[in-house]
């Protein structure tokens, strides 16, 4: 199931085999998106914009009602208009009925939250596990379950076991991973025109399906990286950990600049001209916050400690401590 590939062509699977599998598909896959928060609502709208019939699923009836009217409970430029356009066209609908989505759809994106556990650095995976289980139980035909939520490494393998235990007789489904890389304020653009696409744990059939789903950005040159499940799970959290490290680095250097009489802003500008470093995330004084970076590096610390990767734990502890100072 796992494979490694260069970013240039994205396929550890034989490209001719993938192309043949895509060609053999008679109709576009129908898509469900489980969870309609920031990630899910954006992904559902973008999939509809790419020409797919999409069902967005959420357990909150008030959220489903609002989205069905094009009202988005958070700020993201362009998203309300995109949702309303495709709700009115009939291409996008929202429901609380996950069984309906499972029965009617072919590709199921898991986009539920993975908050930090109360009193722990670990990620709360109950929403991901429940959503995946319910989708698998409701399948009326063979399907593909695609994780997009940010999860600790090893989660997808466990989800495969859960799915295998609850699938209806005669139905098959695989679990693969396709992490998101959204920036607040640019989520619609980042979904429609991503700077890279990662597929984790795909075989010929599942990769062909995902390449059909993402055919539009792939056709414009977006690189595809096809890899094993653990690598795909680690890509997003590692990216966030690196950005957090960059922020904590410049804040640590800011202390040195203050002690030495140096100008940290000028120093950051000078560093930024080095294309190996870049200027982004080098603004001293502003620590990282929000809903992703803090919880993601703490979940990474927790999982790294479970796996005995103590240097990663130590590095992330320093990053977190500098940020909290």
Regions picked out by a protein language model, each given a short descriptive name:
Residues 2-325:
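Structural/interface elements that position substrates and couple domains in central-metabolism enzymes
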């Amino acid at each position: 199931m796992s494979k490694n590939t260069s970013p240039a062509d994205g396929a550890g699977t034989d490209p001719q085999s993938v192309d043949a599998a895509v060609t053999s598909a008679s109709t576009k896959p129908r898509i469900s998106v489980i969870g309609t928060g920031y990630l899910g609502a954006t992904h559902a709208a973008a999939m509809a914009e790419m020409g797919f019939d999409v069902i967005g699923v959420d357990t909150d009836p008030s959220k489903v009602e609002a989205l069905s009217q094009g009202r988005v409970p958070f700020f993201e430029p362009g998203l309300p208009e995109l949702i309303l356009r495709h709700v009115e066209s009939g291409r996008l609908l929202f429901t609380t009925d996950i069984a309906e989505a499972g029965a009617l759809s072919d590709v199921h994106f898991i986009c539920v939250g993975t908050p930090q556990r109360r009193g722990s650095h670990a990620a709360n995976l109950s929403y991901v596990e429940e959503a995946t289980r319910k989708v698998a139980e409701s399948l009326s035909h063979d399907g593909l379950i695609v994780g997009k939520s940010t999860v600790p490494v090893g989660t997808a393998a466990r989800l495969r076991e859960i799915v295998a235990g609850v699938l209806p007789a005669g139905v098959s489904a695989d679990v693969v991973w396709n992490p998101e890389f959204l920036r607040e304020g640019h989520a619609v653009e980042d979904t429609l025109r991503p700077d890279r696409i990662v597929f984790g744990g795909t075989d010929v059939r599942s990769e062909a399906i995902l390449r059909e789903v993402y055919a539009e950005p792939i056709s414009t040159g977006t690189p595809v990286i096809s890899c094993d499940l653990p690598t795909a799970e680690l890509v997003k959290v590692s990216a966030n950990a690196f950005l957090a490290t960059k922020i904590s680095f410049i804040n640590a250097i800011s202390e040195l600049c203050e002690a030495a009489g140096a100008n940290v802003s000028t120093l950051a500008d000078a560093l930024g001209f080095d294309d190996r470093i870049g200027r982004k995330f080098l603004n001293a004084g502003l620590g990282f916050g929000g809903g992703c970076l803090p919880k993601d590096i703490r979940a990474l610390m927790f999982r790294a400690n479970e796996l005995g990767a103590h240097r990663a734990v130590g590095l992330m502890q320093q990053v977190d401590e500098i940020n909290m100072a």
